[in-house]
C-alpha cells in the first residue's frame, strides 16, 4: 500500500508537466486573438500551475479574459520546456483582463491570496519548483501599496500560521504561454490533474 501511495504521489507531481505535448521550438510565439478592449485593465499574478490560476480568475465577475504565460525571470521568449527546468527565473503566471468599473485591483489581490497558499516557497499543491512560486506583480506604486497593505492586513489578523513568502515585484515583461495552455482547465475538465487540483 505504501508503495502504491508513493507511486501515486510521484505521478501527481509530474502531471502538470507531463500532460502537455512537447513543444516545437520552431512554432511562432502565440499571441491572443482578442484585440485590446477599451476600458479594460490588466493585472498579473503567479500562484502555482497557471491552468488552475487561470480558472480561478475567470470565475470572477468583471474579469473578461485570462491568459496563461510566464513572468518574473530573465530569459526572453521562454517556452514551457525551459520554464520546467526552473532555470529561467520565470514563474507560471496569468494576465487578467478586467473591467475596473466592475471589479477592483484590490479585489483581485484578495482573490489571489485566497486562492493559493502564499506561505509556501517554490511550491503549490503537488507542484514544486521556482516556476510555481507566489508572485503579485505591480505596474505602478498604487498597485504595489495595495498588495503590501493587504499582506500587512493578513499578517496582522494572523490568517496564515506561517509567514507570507509571496514576492511583490514590478512587472517587467509577460510572455504568453503556448496555445495549448490557454483555457486548459476549460478544455480538459477530465484531466486527472485538473479534477484533483482545480476549482
Where in the sequence are the language-model features?
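Sec-dependent N-terminal signal peptides
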Residues: 4-12
Amino acid at each position: 500500500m505504501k508503495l502504491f501511495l508513493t507511486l501515486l504521489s510521484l505521478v501527481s507531481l509530474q502531471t502538470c508537466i507531463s500532460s502537455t505535448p512537447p513543444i516545437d521550438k520552431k512554432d511562432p510565439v502565440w499571441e491572443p486573438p482578442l484585440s485590446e478592449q477599451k476600458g479594460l485593465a490588466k493585472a498579473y499574478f503567479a500562484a502555482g500551475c497557471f491552468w488552475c490560476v487561470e480558472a480561478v480568475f475567470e470565475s470572477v465577475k468583471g474579469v473578461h479574459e485570462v491568459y496563461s504565460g510566464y513572468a518574473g525571470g530573465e530569459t526572453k521568449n521562454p517556452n514551457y520546456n525551459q520554464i520546467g527546468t526552473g532555470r529561467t527565473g520565470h514563474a507560471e503566471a496569468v494576465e487578467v483582463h478586467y473591467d475596473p468599473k466592475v471589479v477592483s485591483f484590490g479585489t483581485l489581490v484578495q482573490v489571489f491570496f485566497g486562492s493559493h497558499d502564499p506561505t509556501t516557497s517554490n511550491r503549490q499543491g503537488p507542484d514544486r519548483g521556482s516556476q510555481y512560486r507566489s508572485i503579485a506583480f505591480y505596474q505602478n506604486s498604487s498597485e504595489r501599496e495595495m498588495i503590501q497593505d493587504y499582506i500587512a492586513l493578513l499578517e496582522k489578523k494572523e490568517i496564515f500560521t506561517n509567514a507570507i513568502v509571496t514576492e511583490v515585484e514590478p512587472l517587467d515583461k509577460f510572455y504568453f504561454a503556448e496555445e495549448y495552455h490557454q483555457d486548459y482547465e476549460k478544455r480538459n475538465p477530465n484531466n486527472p490533474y485538473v479534477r484533483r487540483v482545480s476549482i
